[in-house]
From Swiss-Prot:
Role this protein plays: Catalyzes the formation of S-adenosylmethionine (AdoMet) from methionine and ATP. The overall synthetic reaction is composed of two sequential steps, AdoMet formation and the subsequent tripolyphosphate hydrolysis which occurs prior to release of AdoMet from the enzyme.
Entry protein name: S-adenosylmethionine synthase
Residues the record lists as binding L-methionine: 57, 100, 240, 271
Annotated GO CC locations: cytoplasm
Cofactor: Mg(2+); K(+)
Species: Acinetobacter baylyi (strain ATCC 33305 / BD413 / ADP1)
Top-rank taxon: Bacteria
Lineage: Bacteria, Pseudomonadati, Pseudomonadota, Gammaproteobacteria, Moraxellales
A Gene Ontology molecular function term of the record: ATP binding
Amino acid sequence: MREYAVFTSESVSEGHPDKMADQISDAILDAILKEDPYARVACETLVKTGAVVLAGEITTTANVDFEAIVRQTVNGIGYHHSDLGFDGSTCAIINMIGKQSPEIAQGVDRQKPEDQGAGDQGLMFGYASRETDVLMPAPISYAHRLMERQAELRRSGALPWLRPDAKSQVTFAYENGMPVRLDAVVLSTQHDPEISQAQLKEAVIEEIVKPVIPSEMFHAGTKFHINPTGMFVIGGPVGDCGLTGRKIIVDTYGGMARHGGGAFSGKDPSKVDRSAAYAGRYVAKNIVAAGLADKCEIQVSYAIGVAEPTSISINTFNTAKVDEELIIALVREHFDLRPYGITRMLDLLQPMYKQTAAYGHFGREGSDTAFTWEKTDKVEVLKDAAGL
């Protein structure tokens, strides 16, 4: 398959309305898992001017204050005053959460935990590449870092006129499957009305873009599109309705890898949309880190109520150092991809999900985002088994 000559990915900030919804859903999931690790949670959130709507299905023994969690999350993101168009302390909260269908539960629950069935049918993908030090595609990796930098400068007060809502988009030129130069950066950030566009553009380029992207990637033709529509004062849920699960490409690989269509946030690990996608990343990252391939995409699929995957497929894009059939055999031998096996392998019953809900679920290795699916603890066993 011909490689892309250029590739673009986007990210959004924690104050983007869709990401607000994701964070609320995952904050509720975390609060429930703290009290009831085996709860069944499917929590959806909608945010719009002055209101948060919760819906979905939750079956749990936990006693959770949904309203308090919503308000704490919204205020923590930075929407804590009516001047910003949304105030977590005064917004209306509508709760429409019910319980999980017993017909779904009977397909998942088993007397022996290892026989736990998948919570639904579906297909999931995992991916890793040698493009960056975290084995992620460069465009999405740097798009996320731009958004994290925007939030850092906003929270620290270094650029006090920044507001929570923002988006980034990064285009890299490629040669031989590797990024070689930065062709374009798009960054739109919400701001106070007093700041001039000239000041904003200079600050964004000098304080956000240049500290994040390696200097050797810039060239004379690099294009900067900073707040290209001009004023961006009205943002967050006032500007756009936000929904859980509407940023699935931002959450994963920025379009560089395939996506099975299932969102992550608000779902407990029995939902393979989430847990199997995490397992896919874990498998692909260990394959690449072990040197079995320079690039790897794995697909797994499931049937509702059935523990074993219905299929496991690998694509190394002609970069494999060993036969792909051997790689699949090693995956089956060394990674338990049954739902219970994934949960145990990656310790997924911990209340850690709110941290995943902004700036990407993959490629993050910070002290508070050292997610288990980013470990490369299978490298030596894979190398030995492959004879490398």
